[in-house]
Amino acid sequence: MSDAYKLLVLAGDGIGPEVMREVARIVHWMSAHRGLKLEITEELVGAASLAVHGVPIRDEVIELARQSDAVLFGSVGDPAWSHVGFDKRPEVAILKLRKELELFANLRPAKLFDALIDASALKPEVVRGLDLMIVRETVGGIYFGEPRGIETLPDGSRRGINTEVYTTSEIERVARVAFDLARKRDNRVCSVEKCNVMESGLLWKEVVTDVHKREYPDVQLSHMLADNCAMQLVRDPNQFDVIVTGNLFGDILSDLASMLTGSLGMLPSATLGPVRADGKRNALYEPIHGSAPDIAGKGIANPLAQILSFAMLLRYSLNRAEDADLIEMAVSNVLASGLRTGDIMSPGMARVGTEMMGQAVLREMEKLA
């Protein structure tokens, strides 16, 4: 299987294994009918790994991730482990993976399926047709800058300190990710910062402008202040194609954009690393929802975010855009038929569980293929 793509599957905890099973059905079908060759390795992470190996993620799993074409991640988290030290928490698995793989660019799509338009927080006429991508830089900025901390002043009062720091290279590489994505979409990038009050924002704007001029003159570039961007996302979200921004603003804006779609259970994500010696990027794909231990094992979890995360993997790591389109169209058609899991249920629709939703997507793929 030397010509097969290497895929590491980490289902994790809670509903992770349940929703990942529905992806496995799709993978099996695509292997049989679409010529998709995958060499799949499955490993334990999170609480599942703690129970067997005593650690949230083993070093061997991280090495497997480095050698893979992509990592498909479920979710981690289990309240049964809330009493242990931080380094033993299930959530450490995903944090360590992101660090060891040097993942720096988080891709958060906000795409509204027509059938869910009434679930959006905005009026249908404002949000119809929504399809934007937020690219968030995740290793720099105020979350990691030094100095930081809380100190006691001579008068006894306390002061909290955080420092916003960005370097040219950090900005350049995330800008390239955004411009490359735009070329595969509607060819538009909006760079977001606060250059009017922050020197780091001024550098951000200058560097993005320079990368655009030197390497991507064919892509349409605009600039917007972060506070204005938040307002514009609510006023007219369809003006955006790709938004690229720093860690703090990306954290806020991507959560805002997620609610334009109506349900966190529908949203996939990707996080990309630098280009490796073999020309590929380390990449991890995961739904943005958590492990949902309260519904784990009940067969009612929404598998669509996990399925759509696999579609992103096909598109961005395996360069199989047609296969990704097939999955996304199948999901759209299933929703249009009226099938809903509980988290996206609305009057007049038909409630189904995890397995039935996954099977419906697969049947629709068979019709479309």
UniProtKB/Swiss-Prot annotation:
Listed GO CC annotations: cytosol
GO MF: 3-isopropylmalate dehydrogenase activity; magnesium ion binding; NAD binding
GO BP of this protein: L-leucine biosynthetic process
Enzyme Commission number(s): 1.1.1.85
Cofactor: Mg(2+); Mn(2+)
Site (Important for catalysis): Y143, K194
Keywords assigned by UniProt, alphabetized: Amino-acid biosynthesis, Branched-chain amino acid biosynthesis, Cytoplasm, Leucine biosynthesis, Magnesium, Manganese, Metal-binding, NAD, Oxidoreductase
Pathway(s) annotated for this protein in UniProt: Amino-acid biosynthesis; L-leucine biosynthesis; L-leucine from 3-methyl-2-oxobutanoate: step 3/4
Record: residues binding NAD(+): G290, S291, A292, P293, D294, I295, A296, G297, K298, G299, I300, A301, N302
SMART domains in UniProt: Iso_dh (SM01329)
Keyword tRNA processing set for record: no
Top enzyme category: oxidoreductase
Cofactor: binding comment: Binds 1 Mg(2+) or Mn(2+) ion per subunit.
Compartments in which it is found: Cytoplasm
Catalysis performed (reactions): (2R,3S)-3-isopropylmalate + NAD(+) = 4-methyl-2-oxopentanoate + CO2 + NADH
Positions annotated to bind Mg(2+): D227, D251, D255
Pfam families to which the protein is assigned, alphabetical: Iso_dh
Top-level taxon of origin: Bacteria
Residues the entry annotates as binding substrate: R98, R108, R136, D227
Presence of the UniProt keyword Cell wall biogenesis/degradation in the record: no
Subunit note: Homodimer.
Family: Belongs to the isocitrate and isopropylmalate dehydrogenases family. LeuB type 1 subfamily.
Chain's role: Catalyzes the oxidation of 3-carboxy-2-hydroxy-4-methylpentanoate (3-isopropylmalate) to 3-carboxy-4-methyl-2-oxopentanoate. The product decarboxylates to 4-methyl-2 oxopentanoate.
PANTHER family linked: 3-ISOPROPYLMALATE DEHYDROGENASE (PTHR42979:SF1)
Protein name: 3-isopropylmalate dehydrogenase
Gene label: leuB
